[in-house]
Amino acid sequence: MLSKKQLRLDMKAVANALKKRYFYFDVDHLIELESNRKKNQIETQNLQNLRNMQSKAIGKAKASGEDIKSLLKNVSDLSTKLNLAKSNLQLIQSEIDVIVLSMPNIPHHSVPNGKSEEDNIEVSKWGKLVNYDFDVKDHVDLGAMYGLDFETAVKISGARFSVMTGKIARLHRALTQFMLDRHSEVNGYTEAYVPYLVNTESLIGTGQLPKFEADLFKTYLHGEKGETKTLYLIPTGEVPVTNMMRDMIIKENDLPLKFVTHTPSFRSEAGSYGRYTRGLIRQHQFEKVELVQVVKAQDSYQALEVLTTHAEDILQALELPYRKISLCAGDLGFSATKTYDLEVWLPGQNVYCEISSCSCFEDFQARRLQLRYKNKETNKLELLHTLNGSGLAVGRTLVAVLENHQQADRSIKIPFVLQSYMGGLEVMN
C-alpha cells in the first residue's frame, strides 16, 4: 500500500499521480477523515494522561489516609470517555485503512501515458515470423493429436480445464523442468516449494485483497468445534513466495533475494467475458514458473530489466518469436509501478499473446508485509522493494511450441534445449 505519511504530507500530489492511471479518490473526504483522526488521537492521549494523573493521585491519597471516593469516580468517568474516544479513533482509522488499501501504486515516471492496452508501447521484438508453406493449425487442433483433451476435463470439472496424456503431458513437464533448471542453475535463483492454499493476510500482503476477491477461489475448512477457517487457492506463485518473508528483517549481506517456484495457479477469470478463451489460453487452473526478487530501493529498476531478460532467455532458448511491451499507466496491475509484458507469437491464431508479465512494486508490497532490512550506514530499518515475473506461463509456452514448431505433416519439432528432457526425442509424431 501507499505510505500513509506520504498521503498526510501531500495528499493532492498523490491524487494527481494516481490520475495518470485513471484512479480517482475523494481527496476532501480523506482530508476530513485525517483531520478527525488527529483530533481523536489528541483527545485520546489527553484522556489517557488525565486518567494516569488521577490514578497516581489515588495512590497518594490512600497513602495519606484521605477519602478517595471522588477520585475513583473521576477515574471511572475518564475511563468511560477514554474507551469511547478509542472506539471513535478505531472507526476513523479503519475507514482510512479501507480507502488506502483500495489505492493502487503510483506509476514510475518512465511509464508511458495511456488508458488501456491499446496505448501500450512496443519496446523490442525478437525472432523472425516463419512464412509457412502449409495450412497452419492452432494448438487445439494440434493438441488433440497428441493427448490434449478438453472434453474429458469438462466431464471432470467443467469448462476452462484441460487433461493431458501421453506425449503432450511429457512435453508440458519438460518445459517446466527446463525453466526451473535454467533459472536455478544459470540465472541464480533459489528454488522454492510452497503451499497452494494461503490465508487472507498473505493475499492482502501482495495486493490481491481486498480488491480482487472475485477473481479468487475460496475454500472453507470446518473445525471439530464448529469454527471455520478460510483459505484461498493461489492465483500465482508470487503470493506464497513473497509471503515467506512477511514480518522479516533481512540481513543486508543476504540481499538481493531471488526465488523461483513452480506452482499451479487458480483464477476464476471473472472479468474475462468476451476475451479470447479458446483452448489453453485462459484456464481456471494453469501452471507457471514464477520469479521473485527482493532488493534494496536503489536497485529495483535495474533488477526489473535483468529479471525481464531472464524470462526472455527462456523464449529465445525455445526459439519462440516474441515482443516486449511497456504497459501504459492505465493498464498497469494494481500493485505495480512499472511492468513489461512479453507476448509470444502464435501463428495458428495470427496473434501475439501475453506469456510473461514482469513488474516492479517498489515498497508497495513490502509496506503491507513489513519486509525490511537494516541499513548498515544509517543503522535504520528500511522497506525493501519487491519484483516478480513469470518465467514462464507453462501452458501458454506449450501452446507456442506446438504452433511455432509444427511441421507440414503435423509433427512437432522439439526445441534442442528440451530434447534431453524428452528422452532424446527430436520430433514428436
UniProtKB/Swiss-Prot annotation:
Chain residues that bind L-serine: T236, G237, E238, E290, S390
Subcellular localization: Cytoplasm
CDD domains according to UniProt: SerRS_core
Record flagged with keyword Cytoplasm: yes
Main location: cytoplasm
Pathway: Aminoacyl-tRNA biosynthesis; selenocysteinyl-tRNA(Sec) biosynthesis; L-seryl-tRNA(Sec) from L-serine and tRNA(Sec): step 1/1
Subunit structure as annotated in this protein's UniProt entry: Homodimer. The tRNA molecule binds across the dimer.
Protein name according to UniProt: Serine--tRNA ligase
Reaction catalyzed: tRNA(Ser) + L-serine + ATP = L-seryl-tRNA(Ser) + AMP + diphosphate + H(+); tRNA(Sec) + L-serine + ATP = L-seryl-tRNA(Sec) + AMP + diphosphate + H(+)
UniProt organism field: Vesicomyosocius okutanii subsp. Calyptogena okutanii (strain HA)
GO molecular function, one term: ATP binding
One annotated GO biological process: seryl-tRNA aminoacylation
Protein family: Belongs to the class-II aminoacyl-tRNA synthetase family. Type-1 seryl-tRNA synthetase subfamily.
GO cellular component: cytoplasm
Purpose: Catalyzes the attachment of serine to tRNA(Ser). Is also able to aminoacylate tRNA(Sec) with serine, to form the misacylated tRNA L-seryl-tRNA(Sec), which will be further converted into selenocysteinyl-tRNA(Sec).
Keyword entries, A-Z: Aminoacyl-tRNA synthetase, ATP-binding, Cytoplasm, Ligase, Nucleotide-binding, Protein biosynthesis
Enzyme Commission number(s) from the entry: 6.1.1.11
Entries under InterPro entries matching the protein: aa-tRNA-synt_IIb, aa-tRNA-synth_II, aa-tRNA-synth_II/BPL/LPL, Ser-tRNA-ligase_type_1, Ser-tRNA-synth_1_N, SerRS_1_N_sf, SerRS_core, tRNA-bd_arm
